């Protein structure tokens, strides 16, 4: 039962018990706030899925030119840190992988929109051109000199070897006046 049906049901029960319509519209008693008359929309309410709204923030961000993020997994093996990012429909030339100062991995790029051919009629376009960026601070044992990246079947895999010989560097800092 939808929320609207249950609200309307409470209103009808209150009226049957002699509470009147009550609420803000005046009818006395009842104490319930009368819902806006939405019974005309009731048949459509169950068809609206909350998952349809889940994509709205990213669609709005893309329309505003705000970069989206790529879904990414990070696993650590004995020898390396391995990052796997979903890049469906992205070509190698459209992705940039870099390690910034202070060991920050940055994946960025732009997914190109398919060119419209003359004589074609599009019925729906959801895969628009969009920029994406993802940054991850790497752990101290990441050896950024040996980074390897590969794009295969829409998955970008970045392997960063571990520097297992590196010991945490601790030092005493002198205090000056």
Swiss-Prot record:
Biased composition (Gly residues): 17-32
GO biological process entries: protein complex oligomerization; protein folding; response to heat; response to hydrogen peroxide; response to salt stress
sHSP domain location: 63-177
Single Gene Ontology MF annotation: unfolded protein binding
Alphabetized UniProt keyword annotations: Cytoplasm, Stress response
Domain of life assignment: Eukaryota
Region (Disordered): 1-35
Compartments in which it is found: Cytoplasm
GO cellular component: cytoplasm
Main localization category: cytoplasm
Keyword Cytoplasm (UniProt): yes
PROSITE patterns xref list: SHSP (PS01031)
Matching PANTHER family: HEAT-SHOCK PROTEIN 20 FAMILY MEMBER
Sequence similarity: Belongs to the small heat shock protein (HSP20) family.
Oligomeric and partner information: May form oligomeric structures.
Name of the protein: 18.9 kDa heat shock protein
